[in-house]
Amino acid sequence: MKAKYVPLILSLTMVISASAQLKKVDYKDNSQVLSGLSAIPKKVNSNKPGVLILPAWKGIDAHSEEVATELASMGYYAFVADIYGVDKRPKDTKEAGELSGFYKKNITEYHKRISLALAELVKQGANADNIIVIGYCFGGTGAIEAARANMKVKGVISLHGGLGKDAARETKEITAKVLVLHGADDPYVPEKEITAFQNEMRTAKADWQMNCYANAVHAFTEKSAGNDN
């Protein structure tokens, strides 16, 4: 699943910087305890920009931790969302598929978990009017869903995320800016899904961009991933 070359999103996947530390933050969805990670910048920008990070289907991992730490070193408040719950950590791809599949089918539940994580990011100090969402794979789908749900975010970035939406769902106007970074050879996103997504963005009157990277496949930002080509 690894790209044959790494795209220009390197700034979000750099080595961990010593200038920021991660802090565990517990929060709740009714009785379900969620446990995210917060990274607060040492040098605070007056605009207090915030970035919500939605991890891939296995939940919070080393990659999302690295991204949060690097963003904080760049001056952003960063928060890694826990979508599944503190007691739900997938041990393998089968469990990850089952858990992520539940939220894809029950999209309002996914929206709720994203919204709760956004609230925690603001509690950590981020400016509620200056937040973006970035997501990887399953989290990339979540980033697009944050835009579809018109959550209070300035923009979203989806990296090798699923683009599909239930055709029965209404397409509403999207106010957040949308950036999709996609592997041109991703075997999990068919051309018809790409076409439907682009038509959806036009119907939604979104300010959107979609960059397709040649020879890049699924999970191209994951250093430990394989190669589908």
Residue ranges and their predicted role:
Residues 185-189, 218:
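Acidic catalytic loop of the alpha/beta-hydrolase fold
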Residues 152-162:
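A conserved short beta-strand
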Residues 174, 180-182, 186:
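Short beta-strand/loop motif that positions the catalytic acidic residue
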Residues 37, 202-229:
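C-terminal catalytic histidine-bearing segment of alpha/beta-hydrolase fold enzymes
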Residues 24-124, 221-229:
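Serine-hydrolase catalytic machinery in alpha/beta-hydrolase-like enzymes
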